[in-house]
From Swiss-Prot:
UniProt gene name: minC
Function: Cell division inhibitor that blocks the formation of polar Z ring septums. Rapidly oscillates between the poles of the cell to destabilize FtsZ filaments that have formed before they mature into polar Z rings. Prevents FtsZ polymerization.
Annotated family: Belongs to the MinC family.
Gene3D superfamilies documented for this protein: 2.160.20.70
Protein name: Probable septum site-determining protein MinC
Keywords from the UniProt entry: Cell cycle, Cell division, Septation
Pfam families recorded: MinC_C, MinC_N_1
GO biological process: cell morphogenesis; division septum assembly; regulation of cell septum assembly
SUPFAM superfamilies: Cell-division inhibitor MinC, C-terminal domain
Quaternary assembly: Interacts with MinD and FtsZ.
Amino acid sequence: MHKDGVLIKGNREGINATIDMEKFSSFEDMLNMLIKKLSKGKHFYKGTTLILNINLSLIKKNDIKKLKESLLNEIELNEIIFEQLELEEESNKQTKIFNGVYEGKTKFIRRTVRSGQCLNYPGNIVIIGDVNSGAEVHAGGNIIVLGSLKGSVNAGNTGNKKSIIAAFLLEPEILKIADVITISPDGLEKPKYPEIAKVKDGTIIVEPYLANKYI
């Protein structure tokens, strides 16, 4: 669980939000934090399904109704599914070797993509520069950033879950591959080495980029 009590991850249907009510002094504090986090990706989350993992015994029935109505109105979600929060077991499964990336037409961008700018290309996009916070990049294939990635990116936007997103410094506001979405946790120190994001078992995972592994 994230230190602020709200953890958001992508899934096949849309997004998962896990709430730790013990982190909040009131229902209103939790609702405000959840809306604040989801609002960062409102453009991506619109029309999707939110699965909300929460200890329902700690919330009044009227507050559950208020929570659902607030999220449907503020984020414009298609549906909200409540699930009773359970402790998750750590998975000891080894990560399968990723045996390559989708290849196709590639567009090279030799500049920094600044806040407010939006790039869209049906194939792969390689950016020789940075993607600043507030910028958006959408690609039908892979997105490779030879610099820092701090904006919002959507690879495989035609439904290709084999697409990947990689960057020298991977700190996206929103990261989406096909219809699977995730956002970066706040306040975590990022490693100073290249990373690659891909879809595995319906969720997005991030791994260090190892050259001999992806050749």
